[in-house]
Amino acid sequence: MIVSAVRTPFGKLGGGLVDYEATELGSIAIRAALERVGLEPQEIEYVIMGQVLQGGAGQAPARQASIGAGLPIEVGSDTVNKVCASSIRAVEMADQMIRAGDHEVIVAGGMESMSNAPYALKKARFGYRLGDGTLIDLMTHDGLTSTFDKRHMVEQASFVSRELGIPREDQDRWALRSHQRAIEAIDDGKFQEEIVPVGDLSVDEGPRRDTSYEKLSKLQPVFDPEGTTTAGNAPGVNDGAGALVVTSEEFARRRGLEPLATIVAQAYVADEFAYLARTPAKAGKEALAKAGKKIDDVERVELNEAFSSVVLNSAKMLGVDPERVNVNGGAVALGHPIGASGARILGTMIYELRRNGGGLGLAAICSGGGQGDALLIEV
């Protein structure tokens, strides 16, 4: 079960979190997750943190975050790189370890500083005999470009949008909804209980009050002139971290901890490389089937807004009423620090369910390379 869920605000590229390395953000989230429920660092038995952009991060980023949060050196750790699904996979692994009886209490989540991703010069080690060298942006190379077809995620999104018949107009309307819902949630204080401030930053930097359908519809497609994916209906490039404390039922009872949510089922799937828009729904359907549930049994759904097209297609495949999806906005507005987004959608959904009487919640996310993960929880 999950007894704590905390995240940092999500900062824009070069914004309010630019001076923090991913591991520092991870430490802040871990420390806050423990403090929220009165757990001591020495009680934690293991740490699993997702991080995608590990170039230049140093050895064992999850261990860095763990030690930085004040956990004992005896606490082991794993760093997960499953692209956008990294942090939700971390929670799945924690759940599996606890069910196997290996541990009773694990911190799981993710962290990313896309602002601090370095550039690389591949042939610099042995020098260039002749000609020019090219700097490689490790943010786009390791995080945003498909290894298999060499296309940027935006190019894949536009291609699949055409293949699946997802109109540009629908994508822009969903993007507008994402910003509007996120602003409403911020104004209503809905994110306060899940966010730990970092320095002077206490709210997500991405949501725009001044956006409109007219503005979004005038943006030019990115990469593909005939495409439908724009800077407006895609998420930003962001920094942030999130951490959840996952425990056994016996540990929570013994320590007198109130569970925020129970993990009911998990699922993970793989598909053709470009078809990210299908994998959240496929994973979600599998998780529901494992639990013997139907989508109509679910009160809230969080589908990571890797692009508006991903949410639109996955919601259609799941057969879910869009009004139950991303009710407080999503990554198009809030941001998508790739290694931390799974932790964010899971935590946001938990608190939303608690405000509305509980029930089942489904969190699903796609990831580069054509994979997808889903967690079904109950509050």
Regions found by a protein language model. Give the residues of each.
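Active-site-proximal alpha-helical scaffold in enzymes
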Residues: 80-112, 161-190, 243-250, 315, ...
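Condensing-enzyme catalytic core mediating Claisen C-C bond formation in acyl metabolism
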Residues: 1-20, 135, 214-278, 282-285, ...
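Conserved active-site "lid/cap" helical segment
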Residues: 1-52, 56-57, 61-65, 69, ...
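Conserved catalytic cysteine-centered active-site region
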Residues: 20, 51-105, 147-153, 210-236, ...
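N-terminal extracellular/periplasmic Venus flytrap/periplasmic-binding protein-like
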Residues: 7-8, 19-20, 25-28, 36, ...
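Flexible glycine-/small-residue-enriched beta->alpha junction loops
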Residues: 99, 105-159
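Active-site pocket-lining segment
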Residues: 155-158, 191-194, 201, 264-333
